[in-house]
Amino acid sequence: MSILPEIRADIPWPEVVQRLAYENEKLAQRPQGHNGEYFVVCTLYYTPMESGFTFERGFDATPITRPGLHGHKYPRDFLRSVKKEGFGRLREPVNGHDYIRYNGGDSFAFGSKPSGGGGTLVARFSAAAKPGQSGLRRGVAIETPSSTVREVFGSTRWKIVDTGGGLRRWQIDCYYGEDEPLGPGRFMARPRGTTFEYAYSNARIEK
């Protein structure tokens, strides 16, 4: 599950929402309507790796346990990050499980590969969107020709396989893959490999 972190508030959402509404209204007013084309904002989510959450890098790495972890202890900030991103990669597997996933409330569970409602997440291909949208719905493949998206992800083709309660209309949350976090605090929602926050793009649904 893609869970939009509060610390992504540095994205200027009022301005972004206004731009999305304006551009999509223009598309809707064409004689052919949207016709499988939307104007979207691409954001990023990822699977944080426990190995990056150290005191040396400025994280709260105090080892704690939570319901569902059977007494196994993990860095406090790592569990905070898993709570926001949905899954986390463990440094050492537990009973063959390389990941933990957030289970809601204050609870976690050991799991296999990160997945959404549409199966295992594939780095730089899987994406999440707000549920209930008629065009940008689960199972749809889209092309986002933005040069920024191509530069960050090395890809412009996505399949919507996931949802998230904090996602906005016309937002495509692109799955980056596994990485250590960029840094503590607000940078915990960013993978170490990029400082990307958001980019606008047209999105065409593949027929």
Give each language-model segment a name.
Residues 2-14:
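Acidic, low-complexity intrinsically disordered segments
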Residues 22-207:
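Solvent-exposed, well-ordered loop and adjacent helix/strand elements within mature globular domains
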